[in-house]
């Protein structure tokens, strides 16, 4: 039994989610190979070779994979998948873009966002916004699976010595073209990788008031997130959204400010190690999952908290 893990990267840095995906592969058992598809991605291949538990790294260095267009990457994965029992990718934007296409090309079902491995063919995944856990069993010859990174502790990024093999790509499918992107730059940690996250909700009242959270976050070395209500109200951009339809986070510390705790939001942060809730409504659902709760005016509590940090 050999498992293919799709590396998550940007041609410069190997994403931490890859380490969680390898952990899921180790739980399944068998040899683990990692595919690095990109352009000028040799350094990523070397980094992947250092991951604990990886036996081989396949590097497909081709301009067609520079921007991770799924129309180009998915055929490569599908072609390689025929030699593997399982294909795993992190449940990121890329992973969710690649693997449904791969599953369709292989004519198998895809299993989404697993959080635990029961056996080589049986997995657990959240349903109903995380309120229930489904145990699913696959009879497919090749199991195509996305992995929720927060469900598995990352393996060590060093300690391995896997062989690195250069492979030929499948080229440009000619079905799409990369036009451009606008990346928001921030000195704060990336939301899904941060050890501390400070999130604001509708209780912030407007986008200007998020300055209180930015100030606190900078003192804590934290990332800043938001509830869907805050995003829908136009307070902050949607790349800050935490929740079922946003980003799934599980930091060491999650501070929810002015967030009532809608089920969709809880699905995205309830696995955080320590949850602190600040809300004026003592009946807010967020307090049901919080380890510590502060009931009061956030515009008084947050500045006071910042002074104490």
Task: Label every model-predicted segment.
Residues 1-309:
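N-terminal glycine-rich FAD/FM-binding segment characteristic of electron-transfer flavoproteins
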């Amino acid at each position: 039994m050999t498992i293919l893990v799709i590396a998550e990267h940007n041609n410069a840095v190997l994403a931490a989610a890859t380490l969680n995906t390898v952990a899921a592969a180790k739980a399944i058992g068998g040899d683990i190979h990692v595919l690095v598809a990109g352009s000028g991605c040799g350094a990523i291949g070397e980094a992947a070779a250092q991951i604990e538990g990886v036996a081989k790294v396949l590097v497909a260095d081709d301009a067609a994979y520079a921007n991770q267009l799924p129309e180009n990457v998915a055929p490569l994965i599908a072609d390689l998948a025929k030699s593997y029992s399982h294909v795993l990718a992190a449940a990121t934007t890329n992973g969710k873009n690649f693997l449904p296409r791969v599953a369709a090309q292989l004519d198998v079902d895809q299993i989404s966002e697993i959080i635990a491995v029961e056996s080589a063919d049986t997995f657990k995944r959240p349903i109903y916004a995380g309120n229930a856990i489904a145990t699913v069993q696959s009879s497919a010859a090749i199991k195509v699976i996305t992995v929720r990174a927060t469900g598995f502790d990352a393996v060590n990024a060093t300690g391995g010595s896997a062989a690195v093999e250069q492979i030929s790509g499948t080229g440009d499918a000619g079905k799409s073209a990369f036009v451009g992107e606008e990346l928001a730059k921030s000195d704060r940690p990336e939301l899904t990788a941060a050890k501390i996250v400070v999130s604001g909700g509708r209780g912030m009242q407007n986008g200007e008031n998020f300055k209180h959270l930015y100030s606190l976050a900078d003192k804590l070395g934290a990332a800043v997130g938001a509830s869907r209500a805050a995003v829908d109200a136009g307070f902050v951009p949607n790349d800050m959204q935490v929740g079922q339809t946003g980003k799934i986070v599980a930091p060491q510390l999650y501070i929810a400010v002015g967030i009532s705790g809608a089920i969709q939001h809880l699905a995205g942060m309830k696995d955080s190690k320590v949850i602190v809730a600040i809300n004026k409504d003592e009946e807010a659902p967020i307090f049901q999952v919080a380890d510590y709760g502060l009931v009061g005016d956030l515009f008084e509590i947050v500045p006071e908290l910042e002074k104490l940090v």
